[in-house]
Design a protein with these regions (language model features):
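Compositionally biased intrinsically disordered regions enriched in Thr/Gly
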Residues: 1-212
Length: 212
């Protein structure tokens, strides 16, 4: 399988769009490639639709400044079973600074679908509490003012994540655990910290060195 970058570019008076997103080509398994490309385009298309809708609803604002929408992709891991990466979005429609957000894509090449974080763990296991404890310890060591609520043991706090041989990375967008100026906060959770909770035969097991 070959992973490249797709691009959507548009520059007109009053607005500029530059979207980069991953595209998978896999002649041997075209169905998997189509599923991956649909998964990667979904958040891009949603961002474009919202941006264009705002341009229609608030046309009077744009002559004062240029509206901007961007996305970038970073591959964190590409293996025979998994593609894991982060899409970073940013839109500027006025205000003090751009509005950033993150979308992760963890795609199981065996099954041809994106996976949720809960799926790499044993059903019913206390993975949110385990991740919360590790992340809070790491975040508090950075002297952040109040990371507790944004990294509590709520599964909704861990929706942006990637996997690689060195561990599970949790990403917290601006405002979730720190002020905007602190930027995105990343916490690497070594596989050794959650190995006992991983689903046997699951997508993370080979990365963690666990045998089926």
């Amino acid at each position: 399988p070959s992973l490249t970058l797709g691009r959507i570019s548009e520059k007109r008076p009053g607005h500029e769009i530059r979207m980069l997103f991953p595209k998978l080509a896999w002649p041997a398994r075209p169905g998997v490639a189509r599923a991956f490309n649909k998964a990667s385009r979904t958040p891009v298309d949603a961002a474009l639709a919202e941006f264009r809708q705002e341009m229609v609803e608030f046309p009077e604002q744009r002559p004062e400044y240029t509206w901007d929408l961007r996305s970038d992709w970073e591959t964190r891991h590409k293996g025979t079973d998994l593609i894991s990466g982060i899409m970073t979005f940013g839109s500027y429609t006025g205000g003090a600074h751009p509005n950033p957000w993150l979308v992760s894509l963890n795609f199981d090449l065996r099954q041809g679908r994106a996976v949720e974080l809960a799926e790499i763990f044993k059903p019913g296991s206390a993975w949110p509490a385990r991740l919360s404890a590790w992340c809070l310890r790491e975040l508090k060591a950075r002297d952040l003012p109040d990371p507790d609520s944004g990294a509590s043991a709520d599964p909704r706090n861990f929706v942006v994540w990637t996997m690689a041989p060195q561990g599970l990375t949790i990403l917290f967008p601006p405002y979730q655990v720190a002020p905007y100026a602190a930027g995105v906060q990343e916490v690497l959770v070594p596989w050794s910290e959650v190995a006992d909770l991983l689903r046997p035969g699951g997508l993370a097991a080979p990365l963690a060195g666990l045998r089926s």
